[in-house]
Regions:
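Generic structural signal for hydrophobic core residues of well-folded globular domains
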Residues: 99, 103, 121-125, 175-179, ...
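Active-site-proximal alpha-helical
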Residues: 26, 141-200
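Juxtacatalytic substrate-recognition/specificity segment
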Residues: 1-110, 125, 139-142, 162, ...
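Active-site recognition of the HExxH zinc-binding catalytic motif
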Residues: 89-102, 115-119, 172, 180
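Secondary-structure boundary/capping residues
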Residues: 35-36, 127-130, 184
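Short, solvent-exposed loop/turn and secondary-structure capping segments
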Residues: 50-53, 130-133, 187
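Post-HExxH zinc-binding segment in Zn-dependent metallohydrolases
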Residues: 108-151, 201
């Protein structure tokens, strides 16, 4: 179900097509289930910010409320440069959060892995390029593991927020390389029943 202003009808149709195709492509790992997924294409920046109060204005282009099966996204017209390609990426990213909540226990899954899986599946690789992560290391900006989850819960300064995402994706891709495709998904789906440290062992 895609809610939208009349002027955003073409974006709503595009969103439905992107989400339908993506959901089918990941259904063997993360089935959507019987509950509907609701999408709100925000008609204005102010309307979007009402839903994104915990973020700085312009800090994110989409957000998910997995327990409600809801995602709220900015259409390309509310993105810098028109961002049509980014629109599809945002839709896929937010859908992954909803699918993870339906297939694992959110409370057992670290926030960094939740974000990392969302970026991995939506192919947001640029944020954690080897050069970007190396720069973080050289500048002493690597976030200690014990603090990483909190960086997603209390988004503040823009650079630290972006660093948290880059680090999450880098760690997730490392896990994927080490464990392989099947091992990685066995780990993720084990989080239905056990906390991450136990699943990792």
């Amino acid at each position: 179900v895609v809610a939208h202003a009349p002027e955003d009808e073409s974006h709503a149709r595009a969103a439905l097509a992107v989400l339908t195709e993506f959901a089918q492509s990941v259904a063997h790992r993360l089935p959507v289930g019987d509950a509907p997924v609701r999408v709100l294409v925000a008609p204005t920046a102010a309307e979007f910010q009402k839903h994104a109060r915990s973020f700085l204005p312009g800090q994110v282009s989409g957000l998910a409320r997995p327990s409600e099966g809801l995602m709220v996204v900015r259409p390309p017209t509310l993105r810098a440069g028109g961002g049509a390609g980014d629109f599809g990426t945002t839709l896929r990213h937010e859908l992954v959060h909803i699918l993870l909540a339906r297939n694992v226990d959110d409370a057992l899954m670290p926030n960094w892995l939740n974000e990392g899986v969302a970026m991995h599946l939506s192919r947001e690789y640029q944020i954690a390029s080897p050069v970007a992560v190396a720069q973080m290391f050289l500048e002493g900006r690597i976030i200690p593991y014990r603090d990483l989850d909190m960086a997603f819960m209390t988004p503040g300064e823009e650079r630290e927020f972006n660093d948290a995402y880059a680090q999450a994706l880098s760690m997730t891709r490392h896990l994927h390389r080490r464990l392989g495709e099947e091992g990685f998904w066995a780990l993720v789906l084990a989080l239905r029943d056990m906390p991450f440290p136990d699943a990792l062992h």
